[in-house]
Amino acid sequence: MKINKVCFLALLYATLSIAGVSAQEITYRSPVDFPISLSGNVGEARSNHFHTGLDIRGGGVVGAPIYSVAKGYVSRIFVSPYGYGKALYVTHFDGTTAVYGHLDRFAPSIAQWVENQQYARQSFSVDLYPPRNLFTISRGQVIAYLGNSGSSGGPHLHFELRAALSMNPMNIGHSRIFSIADNVPPIVRKVHLYLQDTVLGVPIFSLAATIDAKKNSTGQYELTTPILYFEKPAYLAYDVIDYKNGSNFTMGIYSMEQKVNGTTNFRFAIDNISFTTTRYSNAFTQYNLTKQTRGDVIRAFVAPNNLLHNYMTNINDGIIMPPKKLGERLKITTTIVDDNNNSTNIEFYLARGDSRHINTIPDNNVSIVPWDRDFQYRDHAMTVDIPARSVYETQIMKFSYDGKYYRIGDKNIPLQKFIVLKTIDLIEPKLRSKALFVNSAGHGAGGEFIDGQMVLRTRNFDVYSIAYDTIKPSIAIVKPGANNTLKFKITDNLSGVASYRLTINGKWALAEYDPKTSSLVHRFKPNATPQERAIELKVVDRKRNVNIINTKQKW
């Protein structure tokens, strides 16, 4: 028996070691040396995804040192003009991985190795996986400096912690591994009532009522209209917002539980996030309303094409059926909790009765787009192919062409998958390579002329038109030599910058591109011998228009 026990423990230890998991729990330190103040937290429902980390504010400036939260090794280094920008991945000896994003620069030894790799590949953008023993990191070691790189709206550190085996981001705000001041409970601003109508024989939910919420004398929330009447299947959506102490930045909530007459019919909690399902955040919120408000409008409803694993209870998908008797009430009690366990309750009643809801969903010149089957719209001017499971629930939509504009559904309806628009257009042969689609905001949306048709693959319903990009990108030199840099401003009027190449004295030179500021920066080598240098910059847009400048600069 003892031998079997020893063998089992040895096997367990070996298994955990192979998986990179230690039985010893790690104590994580802060990645910064100042009190943490957040501009974003884990679980915020952002455009097409859940936010996966803590956004630690940098006080409006770049350059603060970033420290490794635990002992480990650098397992990945990612550099891009987009997304996390300059990002460092440190895997710890319990198997978890910390991600540090939007960095200004890496620690010198890491930065030099990355630069060597960039020159070897002749690319600013790189995705690198260093050998495990190349960069061993101590707890508290400076590994990088806080920045504003990539798709960042201001200086901050994006920090996340990913689980050992799944590599899914964990809700480190809720696990409270760092000290973050927060005794502010979530705020309920409104409650929206959606009723099920039948349009062309298809059940469709539409907004029936929006009621303001207010705090009562006990500090909890109620509706300004305490009883909502309904006579059809319904669901509720809650307009909620949350803050941290002393901050005006809005946060996502951790969990919500809705009870009907004391029985839970809907509950979710965001303990972790899966990259494979994160886009279903579009169905987690009431998409069109969330786009219009500061905060989240969270649906107490699970749409049929919503594969999020964060729902723990959803009786009848959160749909509430009206009582049989006229005037009979249902007591709704909903508890909303933030990631520091501050909670808010709201109570009100639903009762069977006339909601006075007038269905405004059009039933003429519309198409039914099912969530669970392929759909194709076709007319004399275009075809639109929408694969099954592209929309989150069956939708009623309009498709039309007026001689210039292609109306493809409604931009307030989100998409999970790509759809394909094909249009029959008589485009002059010399312009076919320059043609592209433009969306309702006037921005280039892509598209190519293929086999006699303009083809667009998109994940956005919108109104599109066809335009032509025949203008080469613009290049301007900005303050040459300032701060030991050679800086350019590169822009394109429509299709966007596709690539660039900088050479100095005929050799490829590293240049950092930041689309936010349209800047391209080459940093001089330290202790370089002052001399005149021949510079060539080539910029190509997505319609293959090319601009090349040649100049000479001395440094």
Q: For each of these PLM feature ranges, what is it?
A:
Residues 366-370, 374, 409-413, 426-434, ...:
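Proteolytic cleavage junctions
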Residues 23-97, 104-109, 123-133, 138-139, ...:
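Surface-exposed, glycine-biased beta-strand/turn segments
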Residues 240, 336, 539-541:
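Conserved structural position at the C-terminal beta-strand
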Residues 357-359, 364, 369-370, 392-436:
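Proteolytic processing hotspots in large secreted/extracellular or virion-associated proteins
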Residues 97-133, 199-223, 259-321, 498-528:
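Exoplasmic/lumenal beta-rich domain surfaces
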Residues 322-329, 457-460, 524-532:
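Surface-exposed, short loops/turns at beta-strand junctions within beta-sandwich domains
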Residues 168-193, 202, 266, 352-374, ...:
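Low-complexity, Pro/Ser/Thr- and charge-rich linker/hinge segments at domain boundaries
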Residues 212-213, 254, 340-360, 549-555:
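Short beta-strand elements
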